[in-house]
Amino acid sequence: MSVPMTVKVQNLGRFLSAMIMPNISVFIAWGIISGLFIKSGWCPNQTLEKVLSPISVYLFPILIANTGGYLINGKRGAIVGSIAVVGAIISTAIPMLLGAMIIGPIGGWITYYFDKISKYKVKSGFEMLVNNFSVGILGVLLLFISFLCIGPMIEKLSCFLGYVVNLMINNHLLPFIAILIEPAKIFFLNNVINHGVLFPLGIQEVVKFNKSIFFLIESNPGPGIGVLMAWFFFGCDNIKKSLKEAIVIQLFGGIHEIYFPYVLKNPRLILALILGSITGIFILIVLRGGLISAASPGSIISILAMTPKGLYVINLLAIIISFLVSFLVSCMLLKISNRNHYVKGSNTKIEKDNFLINSSFQKNRTCIKSSLDSHKCIRNIIFACDAGMGSSAVAAGILRNKIHDLNIFNITVSNAAIDSIPNFGVDLIITHYSLTDRARKRNSNAKHLSLNSFLDNAFYNELSKYLVENNLDNNSSILDFSVRNQNNFSSKKNVFSLTKENIFLGQIASSKEEVIRFIGRQLVNQGYVKEEYIEAMLEREKMMSTWLGESIALPHGTIQSKDFILNTGIIFCQFPNGILFGDDPEDIAHLVIGVAARNNEHIPVVSNITNILDNNDVIKSLSITKNIDDVLYLFSRKNI
């Protein structure tokens, strides 16, 4: 498979995952109700069992279509997708999950192109009329199309897939689906198979039989743990600590990406994964195991929670035996590899780069020093993975703890999905090497580092050392701001200083426009900006709300208004009664911080502000205090 095609398939999997994952809690809730109240459940109840059918028939497809439309064109796309999928639901007799994955995005695209075409053609004063009626009309039209065409087509496709699956089961071929699934997982293509095929088939099967084997095919942690355990016994000593962590994360955290790098270091281990998975599927078929809903993440805890009454032994047996098969095969393959890497007539083993994982440690050290500009100040680091919820979250947590132990408080470490990486405001992006090309396409301005393993402890140690040496040297050109009061003053080179004159407590306003004008006026009065910057701040707010969440808003000017900025500075305003700053009624800001930053100085300024306000207790204190010195103290306490 070519690289561009691989990226396309990964993107498709990411999009399917983005439709399913936000709604996974609903499927879990449905599984809990099913496990409790169906005839074979823990507390059989025919009355409460009646809620299962409406949820699976109506709620699942509508939620998925809503999410799919929202991903393409926000709320308007979500509404059209939700309306349209009803047509497909009532035209068929099967759960319309696959149809929802198609109809939802179609609704989003239709509204997107309609909005694009009509953007400058609606007369002033008719915007609300056009917006409301266009969504209703487009939704009705797509509903008719779904009812007449898309629904019946999806039903035929589902019947065909069901026929193929039954054919495989009757001919004892279903276990061999592992030949496709296990290699696909290693190359981050599992979301396409899992959410595009196995998940819809699983829901259809559960409706009929109150359980499905398809929910346990991809989520079975046994084969992956088998590979990790084999590495633990036959790998080199200095990776055993990370392997212990990987095994715990794989088993209880359900993050399967953890074992991918260990397989890629010795691709022959894919055979162990395949054989382990085949064994597990075979046991589930013979003993009729399965789950009542999706186990997400693929943790042993999730699997046990979604196991129907009476099937605990069967499901655990399938997981354990698949682990043993994978472990034994992996041990044999690693022993063969070790034997092949001994020098003939000597007891000295040659540790080749393409075999031992610890050989990647030295590569990481060299990579960090050669890839990063020693004069660049790194303040915002993002770990990215395909979905942004598994391995990247683990990696971000590891680095965050390390830099915290080193008393580094002015660097932000976060995680994100590849396709959610912002195209500005990021200094360093770290990904698995198979995803680095996609990350570079999302943001070509930031520095990029590639990892073989997200549990490579040596990498984090070297990166932490680099950050200390290059970002915290007193002689380096750190872009920062200090907090000045009688007891606190930083002698470092600063972008600006926060003083009592920048802080306004107990303010009252009737609208966010009034707030922005007040802040803009203070920026002008204190010599930070020219008069024109006030209108630029209002213009920027019309483009998109500067509401950040957690009671905070950060109004600033447009990119074009940088010529109106004289000096970098902020104005801190407190509104105890709150001001509506976002699009939703709940988006109330109590802390409004106006920003004016020259050149690229907005990046460290915003990063530092968000670092300070990353604690709910700090936000609460700043929202109610009546003493300016309290604000100065809370800012200075964060060592900014």
From Swiss-Prot:
Major location category of this protein: membrane
- Primary enzyme class: transferase
Which residues are listed under the site Stabilizes the transition state in the phosphoryl transfer from HPr to EIIA? 540
Q: Which GO terms describe its molecular function?
A: kinase activity; protein-N(PI)-phosphohistidine-mannitol phosphotransferase system transmembrane transporter activity; protein-phosphocysteine-sugar phosphotransferase activity
Q: Where are the transmembrane segments?
A: 24-45, 50-70, 134-155, 165-185, 273-292, 313-334
Q: How does it sit in the membrane?
A: Multi-pass membrane protein
Which positions bear Phosphocysteine?
Answer: 385
What Pfam families has UniProt attached to this entry? PTS_EIIA_2 (PF00359), PTS_EIIC (PF02378), PTS_IIB (PF02302)
State the post-translational modifications.
An intramolecular phosphotransfer takes places between His-556 and Cys-385.
InterPro entries this protein is in? PTrfase/Anion_transptr, PTS_EIIA_type-2_dom, PTS_EIIB-like_sf, PTS_EIIB_2, PTS_EIIB_2/3, PTS_EIIB_mannitol, PTS_EIIC, PTS_EIIC_2
Task: Kindly identify the residues recorded as the active site.
Answer: 385, 556
Which residues does the UniProt record annotate as the domain PTS EIIC type-2? 12-343
- Compartments (UniProt record): Cell inner membrane
Which domain of life does this protein belong to?
Bacteria
A single Gene Ontology CC annotation of this entry is: plasma membrane
Which EC number(s) does the record attach to this protein?
Answer: 2.7.1.197
Residues the record lists as Phosphohistidine modifications = 556
* Domain annotation PTS EIIA type-2: ranges: 496-638
Catalyses: D-mannitol(out) + N(pros)-phospho-L-histidyl-[protein] = D-mannitol 1-phosphate(in) + L-histidyl-[protein]
Q: Name one GO biological process term.
A: phosphoenolpyruvate-dependent sugar phosphotransferase system
Q: Which UniProt keywords apply?
A: Cell inner membrane, Cell membrane, Kinase, Membrane, Phosphoprotein, Phosphotransferase system, Sugar transport, Transferase, Transmembrane, Transmembrane helix, Transport
What does the function comment of this entry state? The phosphoenolpyruvate-dependent sugar phosphotransferase system (sugar PTS), a major carbohydrate active transport system, catalyzes the phosphorylation of incoming sugar substrates concomitantly with their translocation across the cell membrane. This system is involved in D-mannitol transport.
Q: Which NCBIfam families match?
A: PRK15083.1 (NF011663)
Domain commentary: The EIIC type-2 domain forms the PTS system translocation channel and contains the specific substrate-binding site.
Q: Which PANTHER family does this UniProt record tie to the protein? A: MANNITOL PERMEASE IIC COMPONENT, PTS SYSTEM MANNITOL-SPECIFIC EIICBA COMPONENT
Annotated protein name in UniProt:
PTS system mannitol-specific EIICBA component
Task: State the organism of origin.
Answer: Buchnera aphidicola subsp. Baizongia pistaciae (strain Bp)
